[in-house]
């Protein structure tokens, strides 16, 4: 990892370079420096940016850092940690929208692989609902809950609310198992059955319920006759 010396030439400052040449011309260190704005008593903002980037193996690792982990980095206080997580999440959503917008789902495996990339490394369980039209094109993806997925928090009301809002005809549920095992629990079975019944009452179809880990996935449609 290299370090940039800006010296006193204002034309080389990241903000000025971005305005003159465009954001795509800036290095990761320069972009991060623009966001952080200031350093600390011992380091410039460029040195803080350099140290953050040196502490991770790739930019992708940034999205897995918790607020507490970000604040262990000298120069990153509570406010900057919150701001950094917010901008990372915004980038994640932009990327997800570009990838999933109007994509047609032809099978559970393809969607499972995509969701493995998104949820496979998460340390908490996350329940996501994906809403599709009659051509099985994705209309919307909504995170329903983060924590421990149970029937009590996977109530159909919120899930069905987004289906009606986006005029969906079918739903796919996806959640991750941080343990790495994708074997469904009894609770997973109950959530699946409960949601299937709720969807049928509303004239919707529960197409699948996927359980994903970093390296594997489980499809209720492929593995059971529940769906």
Swiss-Prot record:
It comes from Streptococcus sanguinis (strain SK36). A motif (JAMM motif) lies at residues 175-188. Keywords: Hydrolase, Metal-binding, Metalloprotease, Protease, Zinc. The keyword Aminoacyl-tRNA synthetase does not apply. This is UPF0758 protein SSA_1218. The keyword Metal-binding applies. GO terms for biological process: proteolysis. InterPro entries: MPN (IPR037518), RadC_JAB (IPR025657), RuvA_2-like (IPR010994), UPF0758 (IPR001405), UPF0758_CS (IPR020891), UPF0758_N (IPR046778). CDD domains: MPN_DUF2466 (cd08071). Coiled coil: none annotated. One of its GO terms (molecular function) is metallopeptidase activity. PANTHER family: DNA REPAIR PROTEIN RADC, UPF0758 PROTEIN YEES-RELATED. Belongs to the UPF0758 family. Residues 104-226 form the MPN domain. Zn(2+) binds at residues 175, 177, 188.
